[in-house]
């Protein structure tokens, strides 16, 4: 049994009191029709050199799947008013030294998926994640990539496309179950948070809400555990995290949303009035 499997099985028993859902093997993924590319993105000399030196630069203990994503994925660099200024590898975007020295900021998104009972789907990040392993967070948190389909600004379509892609990658939710026009982008926030001495986040984060009943089949390379929570169960989870019980931790971006926005937005979810909460003109610096 691999180290990843042992860590994964060990963590599955940590929070059963919250009604955790079992992890099932991910389904076979259907082929995805890519949008025709009119935008041609060439690798910079820096990116090529990084790829060549990947084996030397990467931590020896980094999981192979996470290593591939760290070097292959190109994040979208933006300024503090969300204008695209370039692109960089996921690896470099999450190195705390580069974040601090170059103020490197990239675009991200956080999905909050509710079922028809208005329960919020949470995930615990896998033990092999490079940043914030084994922390509990909202449904899905990731980055649009520097590709034509995820750079579309109109109606925030690029970010919606990225959210749909990652819900399949991480949670096995097919694209047809989460249509892009069902996502409601509510606002944006800008935050910075260290993960450990080497890694961290500096993101301009799009906050996307969606209400759908979906079948979830988590990918164990990305997700250790999932659970649906109502408001009271989330409060209990927060209390345990604040008290440090059972080693429970929450992601910093999720906690920022919980503390600043989630209660009032949850009200709108229950009332069916999410459109009234939309404020995409603001970028909240937290």
From Swiss-Prot:
Any single GO CC term annotated in Swiss-Prot or TrEMBL for this entry: cytoplasm
Enzyme class: isomerase
Domain Nudix hydrolase: 104-256
A Pfam family of this chain: NUDIX
GO biological processes: chlorophyll biosynthetic process; dimethylallyl diphosphate biosynthetic process; isopentenyl diphosphate biosynthetic process; photosynthesis
Active site, per annotation: 141, 203
Keywords in alphabetical order: Chlorophyll biosynthesis, Isomerase, Isoprene biosynthesis, Photosynthesis
PROSITE patterns noted in UniProt: NUDIX
Known pathway: Isoprenoid biosynthesis; dimethylallyl diphosphate biosynthesis; dimethylallyl diphosphate from isopentenyl diphosphate: step 1/1; Porphyrin-containing compound metabolism; chlorophyll biosynthesis
Catalytic reactions of this protein: isopentenyl diphosphate = dimethylallyl diphosphate
GO molecular function, one term: isopentenyl-diphosphate delta-isomerase activity
EC number: 5.3.3.2
Superkingdom field: Eukaryota
Transmembrane residue ranges: none
Function: Catalyzes the 1,3-allylic rearrangement of the homoallylic substrate isopentenyl (IPP) to its highly electrophilic allylic isomer, dimethylallyl diphosphate (DMAPP).
UniProt record similarity statement: Belongs to the IPP isomerase type 1 family.
Protein name per its UniProtKB record: Isopentenyl-diphosphate Delta-isomerase II
Annotated source species: Clarkia breweri (Fairy fans)
